[in-house]
């Protein structure tokens, strides 16, 4: 049995694992299946053949690999837990609970001192800032950051105080204005009612008639409206005057043309009875 198992492992490229009990148990569950696979792997000459693995053998190999990996993981976890326990035991042996309490108190003191800076340290930082700025010219952003970190607490407190004062003042002003408006409304209502009653009972004629509102008074003319009105008036007058001048010029031109025509006709009638030498010469030449 062992010999056959060793030969099978050699053929499939497996190494023998002797220190794992799970592998031996898994192989003992299926001895008959292993014997059934052997005759197919043997050739007629007596040598072993490289036959393909059947699905049953593949399943067995997968199961063996999984068990081996699980065992490795469990072993590592056990080693880690042992190391942690040993380290905790060493710490407990080195420090007593009183010393641990003292260490915790010192740590808390250091943290509180670091978080709360004194004003003297802040003033020292502010005093040393010009030197820092001169020596580290490119690190001006760091200097500004230090200034802001040093003064942010005081500025925040001042801002909160100013905001609270402003809010209180605004509330007081709003309450005073509300009270004044209420008083004014009451006084107006009282005076108006008393005035009306006096007029009703004292005046014999009753209420005086209300004057009708004038449209001109309601719609008061502005300077621009006045200027526009003047411009329109001038334009209308200029257009009328231009029309009159054009008609006058047209009539005068007609009269001048008629006079010229009459003069030309008179001249032509006067020149008709005169003898012209050119006519006589022309007649003699024709004869």
From Swiss-Prot:
Biased amino acid composition, Acidic residues: 81-97
Motif IGT motif: chain residues: 41-47
Record-level GO cellular component terms: nucleus
InterPro entries for this protein: LAZY (IPR044683)
Stretches for region Disordered: 15-36, 71-99, 236-280
Cellular localisation: Nucleus
Single GO BP term: lateral root branching
Chief localisation class: nucleus
Alphabetical UniProt keywords: Growth regulation, Nucleus
Phenotype when the gene is knocked out: No visible phenotype under normal growth conditions. Roots of plants lacking LAZY2, LAZY3 and LAZY4 exhibit a negative gravitropic response, and grow upward in the opposite direrction of root gravitropism. Increased branch angles of lateral roots and reduced length of primary root.
Tissues showing expression: Specifically expressed in roots. Expressed in root tips. Expressed in the endodermis of inflorescence stems and hypocotyls. Highly expressed in the lower hypocotyl and root stele of young seedlings.
Keyword Secreted: no
Biased composition (Polar residues): 237-259
Misc remark: Plants overexpressing LAZY4 exhibit steep lateral root angles, upward leaf curling, shortened siliques and narrow lateral branch angles.
Function: Involved in the regulation of root gravitropism. Functions redundantly with LAZY2 and LAZY3 in the control of root gravitropism. Involved in the development of the root system architecture by influencing lateral root angles and primary root length. Functions redundantly with LAZY1, LAZY2 and LAZY3 to control plant architecture by coupling gravity sensing to the formation of auxin gradients. Involved in the establishement of auxin gradient in primary and lateral roots upon gravitropic stimulation. Involved redundantly with LAZY1 and LAZY2 in the regulation of both shoot and root gravitropism.
Family according to the record: Belongs to the LAZY family.
Cited PANTHER family: OS03G0406300 PROTEIN, PROTEIN LAZY 4
Protein name as catalogued: Protein LAZY 4
Annotated organism of origin: Arabidopsis thaliana
């Amino acid at each position: 049995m062992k010999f056959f198992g060793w030969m099978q492992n050699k053929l499939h490229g497996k190494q023998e694992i002797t220190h794992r009990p799970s592998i031996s148990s898994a192989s003992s569950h299926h001895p008959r299946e292993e014997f059934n696979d052997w005759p197919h792997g043997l050739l007629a000459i007596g040598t072993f053949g490289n036959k393909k693995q059947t699905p049953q053998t593949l399943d067995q190999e997968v199961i063996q690999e999984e068990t081996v990996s699980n065992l490795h993981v469990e072993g590592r976890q056990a080693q880690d837990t042992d190391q942690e326990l040993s380290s905790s035991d060493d710490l407990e042996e080195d420090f007593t609970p009183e010393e641990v309490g003292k260490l915790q108190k010192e740590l808390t003191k250091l943290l509180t001192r670091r978080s709360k800076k004194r004003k003297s340290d802040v003033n020292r930082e502010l005093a040393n800032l010009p030197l820092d700025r001169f020596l580290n010219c490119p690190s001006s952003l760091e200097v500004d950051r230090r200034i802001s970190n040093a003064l942010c607490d005081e500025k925040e407190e001042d801002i909160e105080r100013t905001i609270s004062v402003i809010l209180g003042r605004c509330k007081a002003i709003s309450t005073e204005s509300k009270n004044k408006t209420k008083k004014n409304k009451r006084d107006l209502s009282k005076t108006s009612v008393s005035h009306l009653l006096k007029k009703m009972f004292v005046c014999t004629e009753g209420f005086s008639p209300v004057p009708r509102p004038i449209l001109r008074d309601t719609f008061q003319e502005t300077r621009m409206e006045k200027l526009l009105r003047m411009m329109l008036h001038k334009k209308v007058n200029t257009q009328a005057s231009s029309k009159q001048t054009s008609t006058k010029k047209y009539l005068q031109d007609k009269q001048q043309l008629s006079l010229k025509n009459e003069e030309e006709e008179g001249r032509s009638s006067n020149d008709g009875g005169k003898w012209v030498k050119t006519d006589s010469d022309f007649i003699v030449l024709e004869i």
